[in-house]
Amino acid sequence: MKEFFAFVFSCLALCVYGQKNMVNICVATYNLRMDTPNDKEDAWPNRKEMVKSLVLFHEFDIFGTQEGFKHQLDDILEIDKFAYIGVGRDDGKDAGEHSAIIYDKTRFTVLEKGDFWYAENPEVPGKGWDATCCNRICSWAKFKDTSSGKEFYFFNSHYDHQGEIARLESSKLLLERMKKIVGNSTFFCTGDFNATPESGPMQVIYKDGMLIDSKLVSKTAPYGTEGTFNSFKLDAPMKSRIDYIFVSKDVTVEKYGVLNDSQYGRIPSDHFPVMIVASF
């Protein structure tokens, strides 16, 4: 009998330890929209404070960004707890748009980091396949949650908006790189994929099975609109879902939402951020 009670006590102790060691995390993806005067009243100087207040109010712990120039990222870093990893897509340093990962530096430590381009030669800045506009980049890092000691990977991407072949090949390259770098570890993968779920590039990801669409496994009903692109218009159809958060199989998604925040009729970006609350 003593052995039985000792066994039960050990099981309970392990359960309690597992719960205490659980990492709860708020993850998001947010296309910030590049800073251009062509946006007029929607240009970055007129909305950067809205972006910062949204991030603070929804308590993002870590989030992938797209389109941000260095000065836009620096504006967000005025929130003292944040830092970022990621390089400019034009020169691998600071020039051009970034696919930066912004993270709470008081909570997470960067263990590894890297970048690759969506191109035939992923190691150097350049356009890939049938892309004609821009270099496209993926930035990634391995993080350690300092309180629990748990580690995880985070990948953040921005696919081409014109080249159909480029988007398809980008999905193949993303999966190839993630399998090589991540292995069986916990991960989050965010981005503006410029592709809807039924399209070829996304079907490559779904059929592979490594990346789990957080919306499809959320324990609670998804919040917000189906679409994530709004064109700075409150009356836009908001049907095009092109921004995603994928997770590894060991991640529990407590809730998923597309955040349709606006202030006085203005929207912080031409994309809505997508957010999940998750645990692992």
Regions found by a protein language model. Give the residues of each.
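N-terminal, active-site-proximal structural segment of metallo-dependent hydrolase catalytic domains
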Residues: K2, V16-I79, D90-E97, K172, ...
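Sec-dependent N-terminal signal peptides
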Residues: F4-L12
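Active-site-proximal beta-strand elements of phosphoester/diester hydrolases
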Residues: N24-T36, S99, E112-F116, K150-D160
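Short, Asp-centered acidic motifs that coordinate Mg2+ and/or phosphate
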Residues: I25, D61-I62, F152, T186-F188, ...
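Active-site metal-binding loops of divalent metal-dependent hydrolases
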Residues: Y30-L32, E67, S157-Y159, G191-F193, ...
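Structured beta-strand-rich core segments of catalytic domains in phosphoester-bond hydrolases
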Residues: I62-E151, G257-V258
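Active-site neighborhood of phospho(di)ester-bond hydrolases with catalytic His/Asp-centered motifs
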Residues: F63-Q66, V87, F188-D192, D213-L216
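Metal-dependent phosphoester-hydrolase catalytic domains
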Residues: R107, I165, E169, E176-F187, ...
